[in-house]
Amino acid sequence: MEKFKRSLELERSQQHNFIYPLIFQEYIYALAHDRGLNRSIFLENMGYDNKSSLLIVKRLITYLITQMYQQNHFIFSGNDSNQNKFLGYNTKLYSQMIFEGFAVVVEIPFYLRLLSFLEGKERVKSHNLRSIHSIFPFFEDKFSHLNYVLDILIPHPIHLEILVQTLRYWVKDASSLHLLRFFLHEYPIWNSLITQKKSSFSFSKRNQRFFLFLYNFHVCEYESIFVFLRNQSYHLRSISSETFLERISFYKKIELELFTKDFKAILWVFKEPFLHYVRYRGKALLVSKGTSLLMNKWKYYLVNLWQCYFYMWSQPRRIHINQLANHSLDFLGYLSSVRLKPLMVRSQMIENSFLIENAIKKFDTLMPITPMIESLVKAKFCNVLGHPMSKPVWAALSDSDIIERFGHIYRNLSHYHSGSLKKMSLYRIKYILRLSCARTLARKHKSTIRAFLKRLGVGLLEEFFTEEEQVFYLTFPKASSTSGELYRRRIWYLDIICINDLANYE
C-alpha cells in the first residue's frame, strides 16, 4: 500500500511544468510559423506572409495580459474589422499565431515525458509506433482469438473549461492556464469551434492543432485511469478506493458506486486476461474473449466514468456490443472482420484415407467504397452517383500541376489502402480521379474529353502508376503472371500517421 502510494507521489511530482516564460520567447512562434509553412499534418498553412511580425505577437500578448488583470474586456470580433486592429495590424491573424505558439509550448512537457519513457529501453522506434498501419497486424494476430467488441464513440466535453481543468492537473502553472482561459472566453469564435456532427467529435480547420491537443489530452486522461486500473488489477484487493479518487480529486471528491459498491466485481472485470483497447481520434474499440455479460459491465463502467468524473455526457447508442464473428468493424478507413474459412485436410492411416474438414478464423480488411465516394463527392471530384466531374478551381493551374495534384491524391489513397484484401474499390477510385483529371484539362483547353485524350495519349495514365504497383512487382516478381493472386496481397506501411482528407486538399 505505502509503496504504491509512493509511486503515485513520484508521478505527481514530475508534473510541475512551468511553461509561462516560454510564451514570451520569439523562437516559439517562429517554430509554429515554420510548421504552418511546411504544411505539417497537424497544422495547416494559415496564410502567413512576410508582413507578420513576431514582435507584434509579443506586444499583443503583453497587452492582453494587462487587459486580463485590469479586467478590461478586449474582445476579438469576427465581423468588425475595425475592432480587430492592434497597432494597425489585424489581431485575428496574430491571435491565431498566439494559439499555435501556445500549442507548441504545452506540447513540450509531454514530449519530454515521451523521451524519458523511451530512453534506455529496447523499443521500436517512436515513428514506427505512430503509424496507423501498425495497428492492423496487431488486429490480425489477436482478433481471431477474441469474441466480442465494444464499438465506442467517445463523448465530447460540454464546455471548453473542462479541457482547461484537465490540463490543470499536469501543468501546475496558474499564469499560463489563466491566459489560456482568457483567450477561450474573450474570443467568441473559439466558443463555437467544437461542433457535433453525426455523434462524432470534430473541430473547425482553424487552430485545429491546439484544440486537438486539448481534446486528445482530455481523452488520454481518462484512458490513463483505465490503464492504471488495468495494470494494477492484481494488487487492487489490498488498496482502498480513496487512492484512486486522489488522482481525480481536482474534479470532485465523491464516493461513487463505481469504486465503492461491489468493488470485487469491478476488480474481476479488470482482471480479464484477453482484453485489448485501441483508439483513433473519437472512436475506440474494446475487444475481449469474454461473454456479452462482461462487455455489458464494461459498458456500464465507461459510462459512469465519463459522466461522473469527466462530465462527458454519454448516450447508450454511442456504445455498441457486437460479436466479431457476425460484425464488420468500420475503423481507420477499413472494414475489418473475422470470418471462418473452410480447410480440407487429407489424412492417411495405413490402407485408409479420409478427409477432415476444419474451419479456421481469418482476419480480413476491405476498403469500403461508399465512404470513399462520399469523400470524393465532398471534394467535388464526382457526383453522388460516382460520375467523374471536372475541378474548375484547378483549371487555372498548369497542365503538369493539375496532373500532379490528381496523381498525388490517388497515390496517397492507394498507399493508405494497400492493406485491402481486394483492390477493385481502388480501381474505381483510380477511374474517377483519372477521368476527373481529363475533364479538368479539357475544360481548361476548351476541348472535349475525347479530343483531348486522343491528343494526350497514354501520358496521362503514367502519372497514376502508384508506388504500391511498383512494390508489388519488385517484391513478388515470380507472381507477376498471376495478377489476381498478386493484388490479393496486403502491405502495411510504418510511415502513415494520418488519414488523408480530400475535402481539405486545396
UniProtKB/Swiss-Prot annotation:
<keyword id="KW-0694">RNA-binding</keyword>
<dbReference type="InterPro" id="IPR002866">
    <property type="entry name" value="Maturase_MatK"/>
</dbReference>
<keyword id="KW-0819">tRNA processing</keyword>
<keyword id="KW-0150">Chloroplast</keyword>
<dbReference type="GO" id="GO:0008380">
    <property type="term" value="P:RNA splicing"/>
</dbReference>
<dbReference type="InterPro" id="IPR024942">
    <property type="entry name" value="Maturase_MatK_N"/>
</dbReference>
<comment type="function">
    <text>Usually encoded in the trnK tRNA gene intron. Probably assists in splicing its own and other chloroplast group II introns.</text>
</comment>
<dbReference type="GO" id="GO:0003723">
    <property type="term" value="F:RNA binding"/>
</dbReference>
<keyword id="KW-0934">Plastid</keyword>
<dbReference type="Pfam" id="PF01824">
    <property type="entry name" value="MatK_N"/>
</dbReference>
<dbReference type="GO" id="GO:0009507">
    <property type="term" value="C:chloroplast"/>
</dbReference>
<dbReference type="GO" id="GO:0006397">
    <property type="term" value="P:mRNA processing"/>
</dbReference>
<keyword id="KW-0507">mRNA processing</keyword>
<dbReference type="GO" id="GO:0008033">
    <property type="term" value="P:tRNA processing"/>
</dbReference>
<protein>
    <recommendedName>
        <fullName>Maturase K</fullName>
    </recommendedName>
</protein>
<dbReference type="InterPro" id="IPR024937">
    <property type="entry name" value="Domain_X"/>
</dbReference>
<comment type="similarity">
    <text>Belongs to the intron maturase 2 family. MatK subfamily.</text>
</comment>
<dbReference type="Pfam" id="PF01348">
    <property type="entry name" value="Intron_maturas2"/>
</dbReference>
